[in-house]
Amino acid sequence: MIRKLFAFGLAAVLALTPVQAFGKTVSITNVSYDPTREMFEQYNKIFEEHWKEKTGEDVEVTQSHGGSGKQALEVANGLDADVVTLALEYDIESIENAGLIEAGWQDKFDNESSPYTSTIVFLVKKGNPKVIKDWDDLTKDGVGVVTPNPKTSGGARWNYMAAWAYADKKYDGDETQMKDFIKKLYQNVVVLDSGARGATTSFVENGQGDVLVAWENEAYLSMRDYPDEYEIVTPSVSILAQPSVAVVDEVVDYRGTRDVATEYLNYLYSDEAQEIEAENYFRPTNEKILKEHSDVFDLSVDLVNICDYGGWDEVQKKHFTDGGIFDEIYER
């Protein structure tokens, strides 16, 4: 009701006031997840130039970052976002279920509304003193693991499912052994932060743990910011992490920002934007640009797809809802 009254009032003001009195600036808010801060800071600058050239309007983009699940809950509970760029499809579906995003949002943009991808890797201290090579090593005695909480972080759910996929292959689908494997891994977790950036801070800046399970881009950013202190280990099995994007229909309709919000997400697929994504260590969906960065990205790693486990609705229900497998195996 409040939003309807706002929209009515705005329409009345627009009808009575000359357009030029409002100037030529439009503002939108992008609610995103933890590791995209630096990338969107760069992207927003080129998008503002693109929008100015295309329409003559100035645009200001506000960013909001945090654990993906927590961010989705904030939007569902009323945080105004013109667009959401979250860690996984399920988090956007939760906003859809709150009635703020129209059904079929996955088909509004290319590649199922996933303009870039990532995967999960390990970040270890230079020289790899614990000799960590694969997921098995994260279950050994004396190894301290840092990973975010899958109850609040989308990246953490990708981490968990990458480990689950490894256990699936190792134990040929025997869920009893798979659960035991995941339990041993989480018994070694020394800190369970609410989001991916918090986990990176715990490991890189606070010196907690021996290995950080991380988004590929987070690991590379840490190596860039702390040269000669860390190295990346790519496990034998990981997962194709597909962050998703969507326009928040209810918000853009009452704010009158649908055109600029839609173009904001569309332009993420442009060559210029795909280069920025690659520079920030996200994998571009443009295959040509991805291959141009093959010196950075390991394109030979065995990446499973979340669809192999029934998609995010099934995975969320089985693993991460209250009483799910994560609750079974994680001893607080």
Per-region residue spans from a language model:
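Positively charged n-region of N-terminal signal peptides that target proteins for export
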Residues: 1-5
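Short beta-strand->loop
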Residues: 31-33, 124-126, 144-171, 185-189, ...
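Sec-exported extracytoplasmic/periplasmic mature domains
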Residues: 44-53, 76-80, 89, 96-100, ...
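Short helix-loop capping/hinge motifs at secondary-structure junctions, enriched
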Residues: 127-133, 152, 165-173, 251-258
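Ligand-binding pocket segment of bilobal, Venus flytrap-like solute-binding proteins
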Residues: 171-236
